[in-house]
Amino acid sequence: MGISGSTEYTPKKRTNFGTIRDQYKTLEEVQDALRESGLESSNLILGIDYTKSNTWTGKRSFNGRCLHAIDGSGRTMNPYQQAIHICANTLEPFDDDHLIPAYGFGDVTTTDKGVFPFFPEERMCNGVAEVLQRYNEITPRVNMSGPTSFAPIINKAIDIVQQTKQYHILIIIADGQVTSPNATQDAIIRASNYPLSIVTIGVGDGPWEMMEHFDDTIQGRRFDNFQFVNFHEVMSRRNVENYEAEFAVAALQEIPDQYQCIKELNML
C-alpha cells in the first residue's frame, strides 16, 4: 500500500489550511491513500440537479438530449446515471452500512430553497443499485425548474453530519449553471467547519467558470473542501484504457488530503 515515490506533486490551490495537490494517477493509488489517511469508513450523500437548464446543456455532449433523458431499454446511461454508478461504486466499499441519503434540488417544488428526498420520510437508498433504480423511477415525473443553488443540498449535508457526528462525502451532480453563487459560496465556507468533503461532478456542456471558482479561489475556509470534475472532459480523453477508473481518480483525487485535514483540525 501507499503512494509511489515517483508520483509528481503538482500544487493545485492554496487555502487557509494549506495546499491540496492532485497527485494520484491510478484508482489503486487513491484507494491506498484513503486507507493510509485512516479513512476506514465513510458515508455518502448524493445531490442531483433537476434545474431546467438540464434540458439544453447537453447540446454538444449528449447529442442535444436532456441530460436526464432515460433510455427505456436500459442499453445506454445518461450522464447522471453514469456518474452515480461510477462514483458511488468506487466509494461504496468504504461505506459500512451502504445506506445513501439521496436528494434532488432545483425542481418546481424546491427551486433554490430546499431539497426533496428520493424516498418518502427521507428513507435512505440501500446501495448504488437502489439509488439508480429510484433515480429511474422518479426522474420522468420531476418538473424541472430553478433557479440553481447548491446551498440547500450543502446545508442538508451539514445537518446530517451534525446529527451523526461522522465524516461524509457529499457528491453533487449538476450541469454547472449556478444562478445563486453567493449563497452557494457561503454554504461551502460554512461546510468547512464540519467533517464534510464536497465533490461536484459537472455534466453537460458547461460553462464551468463558476465551478472552477468554487474549486480554486474561495477564501475563508478552514480547509479545502470542494473538488470539481468535468465529467465530459474526463470521459472524452484519448488513450484511456478504463474510463470509469479515470473518472473515479479525478473525482476522489483530494479526498485523502481532505480527510487528513479534518483529523488535524480535530473535527472528528
Task: State where each predicted segment sits.
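Acidic, low-complexity intrinsically disordered regions
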Residues: 1-268
